[in-house]
């Protein structure tokens, strides 16, 4: 079969590209290795819609984050959880950024940073500053349903699940992709596989990116009433974040120190658990 675009990966970026190209009348094929969309990075993360607060040593990154924050909110506001206080704090110990520096950074980036008493959230002396900020979380399942509804209305867009590319080759001016029992061609191939990018590079004979892979655990939990409408992120070092997880009613708990369990610097991620689980680590 011949298409205008072949997209590898049915996460947020893959389905976004499919919806945009399909709405423009192009014939699109999406190949997803998993049995459903949004099963990896789009869902397995903090669900934080970044405003730029994480980047006090890069104004350009912070400003770009703030710009795309507003764009994401405008386009996908229906999947956001916005009704909570997002608090950033700077630790008084082992932090690369203190309260005064964080204030200056936010002012220069043009993002909200309103002082609140650190003792409202932390034991005395632990943090030298705490700030009310503007940041939201998104619900991946709500966003997934929206994309699938939009794509279902586009007969020129096809999604094949449980189809991992086995072979990619040039066929004249087109790319020929074989995935299981399917072979398709298109003049344009989009790799939207995120952490799977080097798998695709290997099929193409391209050099791999130097990627650090981490096997991470994100804890989803219920919190007491005092924290239900609060998110807390402690900067700027080996600290933690506790924040609402989309519209689920749960909070995610992550730690710079304890969330990553293992690290791989191989071109394609390799972890000991893969040998016991058919190549894919599971909880």
Sequence positions of predicted segments:
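Hydrophobic anchor at the start of a short beta-strand
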Residues: 26-28, 113, 189
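N-terminal Rossmann-like FAD-binding beta1-loop-alpha1 element of flavoenzymes
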Residues: 3-29
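Short beta-strand to alpha-helix junction loop
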Residues: 56, 90-99, 130-149, 283
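Central helical "cap/lid" subdomain
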Residues: 38, 182-235, 245-250, 262, ...
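Helical element adjacent to the flavin cofactor pocket in flavoenzyme catalytic cores
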Residues: 131-188, 192-202
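Glycine-rich FAD pyrophosphate-binding loop
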Residues: 22-44
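Dinucleotide-binding Rossmann-like beta1-alpha1 core, especially the glycine-rich loop
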Residues: 46-129
């Amino acid at each position: 079969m011949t298409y205008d675009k072949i997209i590898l990966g049915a996460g947020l970026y893959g389905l976004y590209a499919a919806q945009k190209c399909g709405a423009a009348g192009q014939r699109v094929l999406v190949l997803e290795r998993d049995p459903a969309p949004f099963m990896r990075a789009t869902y397995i993360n903090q669900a934080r819609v970044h405003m730029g607060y994480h980047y006090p040593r890069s104004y350009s990154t912070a400003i770009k984050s703030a710009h795309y924050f507003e764009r994401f909110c405008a386009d996908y506001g229906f999947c956001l959880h916005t009704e909570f206080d997002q608090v950033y704090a700077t630790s008084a110990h082992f932090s690369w950024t203190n309260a005064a520096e964080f204030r200056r950074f936010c002012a220069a980036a043009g993002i909200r940073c309103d002082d609140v008493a650190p003792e409202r959230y932390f034991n005395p002396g632990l943090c030298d500053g705490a700030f009310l900020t503007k940041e939201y979380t998104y619900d991946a399942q709500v966003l997934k349903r929206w994309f699938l509804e939009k794509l279902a209305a586009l007969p020129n867009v096809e999604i094949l699940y449980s189809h991992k590319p086995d072979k990619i080759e040039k066929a004249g001016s087109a790319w020929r992709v074989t995935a299981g029992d399917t072979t398709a061609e298109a003049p344009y191939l989009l790799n939207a596989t995120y952490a799977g990018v080097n798998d695709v590079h290997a099929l193409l004979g391209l050099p791999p990116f130097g990627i650090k892979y981490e096997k991470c655990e994100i804890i989803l939990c219920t919190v007491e009433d005092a924290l239900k409408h609060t998110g807390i992120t402690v900067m700027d070092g080996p600290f933690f974040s506790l924040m609402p997880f989309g519209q689920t009613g749960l909070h995610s708990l992550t730690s710079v120190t304890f969330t990553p369990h293992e690290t791989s610097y191989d071109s394609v991620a390799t972890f000991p658990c893969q040998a016991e689980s058919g190549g894919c680590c599971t909880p």
